[in-house]
Structures are given as C-alpha cells and as structure tokens.
Amino acid sequence: MSAVKHVISLMAIVLSALSLSHPTLSAEDVSERFAPMADLHSSEGSGSAVDLRQCIRDINTSHPTLSAQDGTVRFALMADLHYSEGSRSAVDLRRCIRDINTRENLDFVMVAGDLTDFGTDEEISAVKNMLDSLDRPYYVVPGNHDAKWSESGCNTFRKVFGYETFEFLCKGWRFVGCSCGPDMRMAPALVPQESMEWLRNLEPGEKTIFMNHYPQDTSVLNYFDVTRELKRIGAVLAIGGHWHSNTLLDYSGLPGILGRSTLSAGGNPGYNIIEIEDDRLSVSECKVVGSTGVVYEPWCRLTLRPVEDRVEYDSHGLPTDYPWMKYDVNETGDVREIWKFRDKSNIVAGFARKGDRAWYTTASGQVRCISLRDGSVLWSASFPGKIFSTPALSGKYLVFGCTDGNVYAINARNGSQIWKSAAGKSVLGSPVIRGRKVYVGASDGCFRALDLASGKPVWEYDGVEGFIECRALVDDTQVVFGTWAGRLYSLNPDDGSLQWVWKCSRPSRMYSPAAVWPVKSDGKIFIAVPDRCLYALDARTGDELKVWNSVARESVGMAPDGSAVYCKSMWHTISAFDPYSLETLWKSETGTGYDISPTSIAAVGDEVIMPTDKGNLAGFRASDGKPLWAFKVADALVNPMEVWEIPGGYRMLVSTMDGAVALLERKCTR
C-alpha cells in the first residue's frame, strides 16, 4: 500500500470510529488526551492500526453512553447558573449535576451561558471545578454575565475552559456554539466579529444545532447576520437561555428553544433533557425535588427540518423589518462620510489622534495605526491578550492596558515596544498621560502612576475595591475613578494618597460608577450610575451636592468650556445642566429609542453629539437641545469618539463594537 493510501486508511479509521469531535483544545489538553496517538509509527502489516482503534475506543468510551448505538441523541441543557460564592446558586447547581450523573442514557451536557454572576476569576474557576464533576462531556458558551462584568476582559473564561467556540458531532448531528457578548461594555448582545468569522468558515451541512446564550432575535444586535449564517450551514434549531424560563421561539423560520435556569428561585432547581430521535425533538423539564429528579412530560415537541432563508434584506444587509434606525437617515446630507472600513475584530475602545494619524485597539489584541486621509492601515502590532483600553499618546509614546496583565508603551511611529509594566491582573482601564506620568487602573485592586519614559512605578495605591475599566479624571489636584464595587475614589496625583471615597447607596455592585468617565466643572465631579441617577459631588470632599433621578445611566459629557454637563437616559432623552447653579438647562427627545450605551457624550462648538448602543449618532444644538441631525455608522455600540473643529464645521472619528471605523464630517451653518 502506498504511503498516501495508508494515511487515508488511517484517517478513515479515525473518522468512522470517533463519535465525537472535541472543541478547540489547549496544547496541554491535546498532549494529555491524545498522547497515546502521538507515537503511532504506522506501517503496513504492523499492529499500529489496531493500536489506533484502541486509542479511539478509549476516547469514545470515557463515558459509555457516547458509544451508544441506538441512534437517539439525548443530552441535558443547563442555563443561567449564575454561580456566586456563598449563594444558593452553588447548592442548586450541585443538585442538578448530581441528578444528571444518575442518568446513564445522556450523551453529553450543554451549558447555555451565564455560568457566573459577575464573571470574576474566582467564580469562573469555581464553576469549572463543579462542572468537571459531571461524568460525561460538557460544552459551554459564555453569557452576558460572564462577559460584561469580566475583571479579566473575558480572558479567564477562554483560559479556564479552553475555547470560546465549539463544534462536535454526535450520532450524525453537528453541534456548534459561540459567545454572545457584549464584551465589557453595557449594550445589547453582539455576537463578536471573531465568532462571526468562525461561523462564516463553517462548512454547510445538515442536521446542525446551534447554542448561544441569547435568543437570536432583536436581543442580539447582529441577529440577522447570525441567523443568515445558521441557515447557510444547515442549522435546524437554536438553543439558549437568558430568559430563565422554558420558551419556544421562531427566528424567521428557524425554531429556537430557551431553557430554564438551574436556580431554584423560590421553587426547585432544574434543567432540561432534550431528545432527538430521527428528526423528532422533544424537550422535557427535570425538576430536582430533594434528592430526586422529576422529569415532566415534554413541554416542546418539534420535527426538525431544513430551513431556507426567506428574509428580505435591504441594500445595506439589514432585514426589511429591522426595528431600529436604518441607513436611510444618512441621506439627508447633514453629515458626510469621508471614508469607512470594517475591521475583522470587535473594537471596544476609542482612539488616540495626532495630525493625520490615529491609533486604536481591538478585542483580538491588535493595535493599529491608520491614516486619517483615507483610512488605510499604516501598521499593526499584536499583543497576547484582548485590549479594551483606549490608548493615550504623548510624543512618541502610545500607552494602553492589555488583558495579559501589562501596561504597554510602544512607539507611535512603528509599533515597536518601548516598555511594559506588569500588573497583578488584566489592565482594562484607559490610561491618562499628564506631564511625565501615566495614570491607569487595573483589576488587581491597584491604581498606578507610572513614569512615562521607563514604565517604572512612581506610586501605587493598593486599597482599591473592585476592578477598574474607566478612564480616570486627572488634573493638578486629583485623580478620580470608579470601580465595580460601587465606589468612586479620589487620589492625590503627586503621591497616590487617598483623598476620599464615595459609595453608591444601592447595595448591589451592579450599581457602580465604574463605566462612566467622570467630568469636572466648578469644583464639582459629575458621574452617572446604573441606578439611573446623575450625581454632583464636591470635588474636595466627595460629598453629594445634588442627585437627579431617571435622567442618566452611565454616560456623561461636558461642554468644551465647562459651562454645561450632559447626560442621557435609557429612554430616549438627553439633558443639559448648569454646573454652577445645578439647574436644568434643557431636556430633549433623542429619537433613538431605548439606549444603554456608557460611551461619553461629545461636544464641539455649539453642538452636542450623542453616541448610542446601536451604531447611531445624534446631534443637538448646545444652546437649547434642538435636534439637528442623525447618522448611522454601523449596527453596534459606538465607542469613545475623537471630535475636532475644522473651518466651517467639525470632524468625527468613530468606531463601533462590530468593527466599523469611519471618518465623518459635519458642515455647520451659523
């Protein structure tokens, strides 16, 4: 037999024998699981083919049900575990796992996101240890609670579980899954660009089942792109969680199933058992009562059939029933697009800009330098972690934080590294350069001032509770920043000594002044908090001076001369306040609908620019709040912008979470 034929023969053995193809594995996993196969020195007539079959048999029989030959696929679906140390969630999960392990006819377990409550490193490691007590394979996808409040910038989930996407086969069925976002910023879900690229590279086939934490409807900003790809690859069902209840949905012809949470929530913990026989699917809830799992009659029965994409799309790729602002708003000509391109990665931070160049970071660990003349990429540098930090620029130094646990300074001209300074955990905060110091916060309970030239610490304040994701307010008298422990800190910029701490009165850490970029005017600090309030604090003492209810969430801004402070509510209003008298100057309807974006409001000349979580911008007259224009850049959250005046108007350098980068121009009539 020729060498080629022999290799083909061995491949045939592997493909025919393996009932399961594993998701992406780390190098350590590959070495551990497949070490016996690494030393196969096959030759015709040797016993190596028999040895290979034995290795495969050992893999497939790590749990006996994987090699069951009845043709029926049976698996457990758990969702919304919300593991939190010391809470009832751990007890509920343990009871569900114990019950699953008693059911010998289950092939595997699917876990549909929100494994943790707050995405901390400790929560992720602890829930992984609990899931490892399952006595059969399990597959997970992260949910919004694992991604939005992740102190590691979504790195720990990938590191601990070994993957963010998966694809495997079981008894003729293909199962695929990916993350849902939103990565670090409050916004509707968005399947990341990296996951979308992975979906686009999947081969078309039949009998595919997709898992994602979210329902694939308008809960996900790019739902139409996801469902279009799912139909292309032959998906016949999408399963998920998020709603904490058993629900049957229809995604333009593609059936969707959402499973209950494992949480008892005043009742019993539980999960679902899904069975597929031929093309017939049934879903039954299992409630764990005491030590007994009670399986109920199926709450869903379906016949799974191929699905054609019958959705009608407009020229921009949006479905005709797209419920939000569409691109036709751009036809008014109030704002002109000079150039625009799409990065292959998510972008979750703003820009640094100087002259005809700008720099931005990506969630795939890239730093790119672009020309403002035409948007061309002048250079790109890669780093070993996701980047959620807006870079700061001073002279040749471009400085940013990375989820690999370092602050980097690179040469702005060519991307070469000048220095890096290690933190104890991921650095999600955006640096501020003032004088010869770099001010930046991390996830290790420490805020630092670093020497710009060397990266060596000038001072460190290690009394921070919660992790830092914002850009601090820095001036000659103080450094002000919030954390995900409900606290706002003010430090001395010279030595890092604590000046004061303000704490939100709401006990939940969800109500933290952590995403807002604070502003300061007339000796007052202004912040917006997810309790929907705008706070004015005495900059010297941290005492509350005034609280405005139901006008804000996490986004604020300030007039260039400090004469007005701006904030926006979740429900289509934007307001302006006088920082001197603390009176309301105006309040306007935005026309943009429900919006939870934390991105700061920008102001230039006599106009105020409000970014949204759906790729839109809206402009208002600064003097009275009159709506002036609207523009759609892309379909996802707008990141911090660069805005500058030009003769007769201004320009806006804009990026969005789904990877769009654009230069816009507005001509103003005085």
Predicted regions and their residues:
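His/acidic metal-ligating clusters that form di-metal
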Residues: 99-108, 169, 176, 185-255
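Active-site environment of divalent metal-dependent phosphoester hydrolases
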Residues: 43-45, 84-86, 117-121, 144-152, ...
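Binuclear metal-dependent phosphoesterase catalytic core
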Residues: 247, 254-320
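N-terminal active-site segment of His-dependent metallophosphoesterases
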Residues: 22-126
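Extracytoplasmic beta-rich repeat domains
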Residues: 331-352, 378-393, 417-434, 443, ...
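Short loop/turn segments that connect beta-strands within beta-propeller blades
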Residues: 371-375, 411-415, 451-455, 492-496, ...
